[in-house]
Amino acid sequence: MEQNTRQLIADLAARYETAAFLPADPSSFMHSVEGDANKEATAFLASCLSYGSRKQFFPKIQFIIDAAQGDVDSWVRLGEWRKDIPDTAKCYYRLYKFGDMHRLIAAYEEMLREYGSMKEYVRSHASTGIEAVSAICRYFAEQDASTVVPRNTQSACKRVCMFLRWMVRSGSPVDLGLWADIIDRRTLIMPLDTHVVQEALRLGLLKSRTASMATARRLTDAMLEVFPDDPLRGDFALFGLGVDEDSK
C-alpha cells in the first residue's frame, strides 16, 4: 500500500471514530441501555437487523427495545419476548417474517439458558475473530435460525463481524469492548458494508466487490498494514468516507 493511501486511511479513521458517529449508526442502540448484559443483548439483536435503509430498520430495533422496556437481556432471558414476537408469517422487516425473528430469539434464549451469555458461549468455542464468527453462525444454524444469522462463513457475515467489532474493540467512543478479554482485536474481520467495499475499490485495496469471507479477509489484511494493532479502526475510515461521498 502506498504511503499516501496509508496516511489518508489513518486520517479518516481519526476523523470518523468519534462520538458524533453514533446518532446515525445502529451502534447507538447499545449505548441507549444500561448494564453490560443488556448492552450485549441489544447489540446482538440490533446487528441482526442492520441492513437496508436506516430509516426503515432503526424503528424495528427500537420496537424491540420498547417492547423490552429497555431491558432486552431480561426480555429474552425470561421469555417475555414471545408475546411481542409471535411465530407468524407476517412481515417483520423486509425478508424477515415474525416467525424468523421468533426462531432467532428462541435460539438466543436457549444460548443464554445454557451458557449464561453470548460472551460465555464464544469464550468456550473461540479465541480469534474468525473462530467467533464461525461459532456464532454454527450455533444459530443448529437451532434453525439461519434465515437471520448466516449458516456458515462462506459469505462475508457482515453483521456478525460488525457485532464482534462492537463487542471486542476497547478504548473507542463507539465500540464497547465488553469481550476484549476473550478475543484479540487484531484477529477481527472487516464488516463488508456497501460503502466500505465501494471506497476500498476506489482506493485500490480490493479488486472485487464479491461479498465473500475471502474478500473481507483481504481487506482486513490491507487494514493491518495501516493499523497493525487494531485493523478494524479502518472500518470507520472507509465507512465514513463512503457515507460522505453518497451525501454529496
Model regions: which residues?
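HhH-family (HhH-GPD) DNA N-glycosylase catalytic core used in base-excision repair
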Residues: M1-K248
